[in-house]
Every structure is written in C-alpha cells, then in structure tokens.
Amino acid sequence: MLAWALLSAVLWSLAGVGSARSSLFSNEGFVYGTVGHPVKIYVKLHQTSPVLVCMDIDRASKETVDPIYLWIGPNENTLTGSSQINITNIGELVLKDFMESLSGHYSCTLSYKIVKAETQEETSLKKKYDFLVFAYREPDYSYRMAVRFTTKSCVGRYNDLLFRLLKKILDNLISDLLCHVIEPSYKCHSVKIPERDFVYELFVAFQVNPFAPGWKSMCNSSMDCEDVTNHNILKARDRIEEFFRSQAYILHHHFNITVPAMHFVDHSFQVTRIDNCRPGFGKNEGLHSNCASCCVVCSPGTFSPDMDVTCQTCVSAHVYGAKACP
C-alpha cells in the first residue's frame, strides 16, 4: 500500500492538477502399444515415465501363452535393467530420472504362442510395438505489460521522471522474488476521447521476467528450476496487477473532483504471457500436438542455442537436446 500511495503522491507533485500429453494413456498410468503406429510419449525432465506396456490393449485383455519380451532402446541396443531403466518380468518398461539422452525410439517385440487345446498344436506369433519418447520441460514464463498515464504535455521532463519512478517502484515491488522489469519504453500521444477534447497520454510498455541477478540461488534445491521461476513470475504478475488496480481505486476514492494531471488511466493495464524454452528445447505444435504447450527436446537434425521457442535445422546435430550446430 505504501508504494501505491507514494506513486499517487509523486504524480500529484510532478504535474499539479488536471481533469479526471499420450493418446493411449490409461487412467492407471500405463501406455499400451499400437501395431503399425508409434505411440508418442512425453516425460518431464528428471521425472519418471509412465509404464510402457509391451502389448496393445486388445492383446492385454486376452490370455497370452509363453510370452517373451524384447526391448530395444534408442541406440538399437537391447535394454537391460539399470538405475534409470526398469524392465519387469511381464514386459513393462519404466524410465527413471528422465534426461534428454533417454529420448528416442523404443521398440518392444512380443513373442507368444497360440495353443490348440485338443491337439496341443502350437503356433508362434510376434508383434512389434514402437514408442517415441521425448523429454520435455515447462516453458519459462515472462510477461509483456502495457499501461497508460495521462500527462499535461508531450514535452518536458516530468514524463521522464514519471517513467523512471514507475520502473523503480515496480522493481522494488517484485525484487524479493528475484524478478525485474526489462525493456521499458514509453511514447507520448495525443488521444481524442469521445465527447471530450484531446488529452495527452503516455503509452508505457515493459517486460517482467524472473531472471534478476542472483535468480539461480533460488533453484539450488530444485531439479525443475522453471517450476520455481514460474511460481515467482506469477506472483510478480499478481502484485503488479494489484498495484495498478489500487492506483485506479486511489484515483476514484481519494481525489474526488480534483485529480493529478498525471495519473493512471483506469482499465489501461494489459498483460500478455511470453513463453521461452531452455537451450536444447523448443515448441512444435505440428510435431508434438499432444504436448503443444511444452518445451520438447530438440530431435536429431535440429538444435536450439538460446531461449527461443523453436528448434532450428542442423543436419550435423545427431543427438537429442543439441544446444549447438557442430
């Protein structure tokens, strides 16, 4: 409340007075194969995958005689148990502490028999199931915001003073969250109000992101750092929104007839979320429609070197999650 009152008081003194994810996911967390069609699965970084079942749903509902399961991993190697790979005796695969390098094509071949009870005649059958497993992480959120303030004129030093003061107040408001205001700018325009004369208004725009100096210190105890930074930026967004809402309240309830010549324009606050992906990850709604909002690991043949949202083409990138084009 102190920040809100401070800005209103300074505005008054500055300018005087004016006029007023998988399609085959079961409820139990099991993913079944489909003969002839690879099943796409998305696993959050450092988390555990769902259970990949070496059967289709129809086969799983029937008796299976003498089943043998053979899992092949992304490097065409036969999978065996390890700290990150767990294969049960009924052919179920679980991937733990999922990393970019675990992404890729997994296949399982199910061999089984059909036995005629009357003759004991055996028929051997095989079915192959393909799974495409991708690491993903949540996008990093930032916010683009815009507000307007009335002003007496488009010339003079008061507009710059207001602009610098506003940035300082907003930075102080969210500094404990290690968020900050970046790329601030403003332009002054003359605006014709319906049934009123022209007024001068400052169109202020800025971004808020959760990467103020020292932000990494908040991630020391979390593997999913974007969960921490996204939580902080959401709180920062709410604080800033409440700040401008309070500016409107103060204007309407504390200034009555006489209002500052420079004041917040009610209902002018706008906010838009911007998503960014960490290096090695990107968005592709066409390729990953089941995880369209996710930052999915860049596939071989692509890379992402920065916080962009797309993976760029690179024919010499042969691994998942490439951050450079060799």
Swiss-Prot record:
Residues 1-20 form the signal peptide. This is Zona pellucida-binding protein 2. Its main location: secreted. The keyword Signal applies. Keywords: Cytoplasmic vesicle, Glycoprotein, Secreted, Signal. It is found in: Secreted; Cytoplasmic vesicle, Secretory vesicle, Acrosome. Is implicated in sperm-oocyte interaction during fertilization. The keyword Glycoprotein applies. Glycans are attached at N86, N220, N256. One of its GO terms (cellular component) is membrane. N-glycosylated. InterPro entries: Sp38-bd (IPR010857), ZPBP1/2_C (IPR048805), ZPBP1/2_N (IPR048806). It comes from Rattus norvegicus. Belongs to the zona pellucida-binding protein Sp38 family.
